Regions:
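Non-globular, low-confidence helical/coil segments that flank catalytic cores
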Residues: 1-195
Length: 195
């Protein structure tokens, strides 16, 4: 549910033309609602494939992963997306875990992974955000989407320590609520719900 739980509501509420999603299926109610919304609204669904690029105005988007056709771990199907707006770069890793991070390090030069903003993988879990991966990315800003007092203990203190060692500014939804980052292509501004 945490992977796509709100996707159908987004499609129902906004004018969504295209949906990029991994080539994975689920028997969950959320996935079923998503497919129903895609069909009902006539959204054009695309399978995320490495090397696919998209442009939205001056925003350039590239799919980096999933690199494999199948994974044992559902989290590893997460689309890993690199985005560039002017001179500012973003890396969105979904719930991809350490095995995908390792594959990304092997597949791409560090210049492809280096990003100003990182959406930290898997809610800051210890199963993601390895030291090697974070060193390749070294984000100026790291965003962790995580529920307050969650039963999983996310985010991991080890991940927080790694980000601190890199000097990253960390924003967490459990502490700050909604987080909005804006950029003009040169600078990044952050506004949070609770701060």
């Amino acid at each position: 549910e945490d992977h796509i739980g709100g996707a159908s509501e987004v499609i129902e509420s906004l004018e969504v033309v295209n949906l990029i999603m991994p080539d994975a299926v689920s028997s969950s109610a959320a996935f079923s609602r998503l497919l129903d919304s895609v069909e009902k609204k006539g959204v054009d669904a695309h399978i995320a494939a490495p090397g696919d690029t998209y442009s939205v105005g001056d925003l350039q988007i590239e799919i980096l992963s999933p690199l494999e056709e199948s994974y044992e771990n559902t989290n590893d199907y997460s689309a890993v997306v690199h985005a560039r707006f002017g001179g500012v770069t973003f890396l969105f890793t979904g719930d991809a875990e350490a095995a995908v991070e390792k594959a990304l390090l092997e597949e791409y030069p560090s210049s492809k992974l280096r990003s100003d903003v990182l959406k930290v993988g898997h809610h800051g879990s210890k199963t993601s955000s390895t030291e090697a991966f974070l060193n390749a990315v070294p984000p100026e800003i790291a965003v962790i989407e995580v529920g307050a007092d969650n039963s999983y203990g996310h985010p991991s203190q080890k991940v927080l320590d790694r980000l601190d060692a890199l000097g990253s500014r960390v924003y967490r939804t459990d502490i700050s609520g909604n987080i909005v980052l804006t950029t003009d292509g040169d600078t990044i501004d952050a506004v949070t719900e609770k701060d």
